[in-house]
């Protein structure tokens, strides 16, 4: 119950703007690996095979609220572990796309969009349920939710966190599994002065 109460408090703060976004520069690859490493017991309990893409061995600085993004990735990763088949794979990878025009922030130059993907090898989500899984308390498979002790709030926190960042997130089915994703701004800390556009006019919407 304590976990449920904490999730509800976090969600209410996000929904009502109490917990504002505090963007900082951090290495998203390091964050991902830290979350995966700290989840080793859960990985073992769910007999999952975790695969991290080669690009996660590099440094990729992003500009976002580090605490919120850690929550987002942790929710995606633990959700994937819970719903992958016994002995199934959970795969994490990223893809980036440069913006047509960079934009300057006080911490550096935002140059592109990074999309983080989390795949689990398990049953698909029914197509008519895909747009509902981020709704508070909603669960596709209620019996399975009870088995894992889920409250239905983890993905709602993802939705609220990404909405606070004004960044894309979502889910889609693939053969033999499900992929969740979210987007972040890539930032470079340098002394250059390339052509800039005002931050409120930047096109941060990546292709789906």
Where do the model's predicted regions map?
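Conserved micro-motifs of the catalytic ATP-binding
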Residues: 16-21, 59-64
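A conserved beta-strand-to-alpha-helix junction within the catalytic ATP-binding
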Residues: 22-37
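Short conserved segments within the C-terminal catalytic ATPase subdomain
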Residues: 42-53
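Short helix-loop "hinge" at the ATP-lid/N-box region of the Bergerat-fold HATPase_c
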Residues: 80-81
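Short conserved segment of the HATPase_c
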Residues: 125-139, 197-198
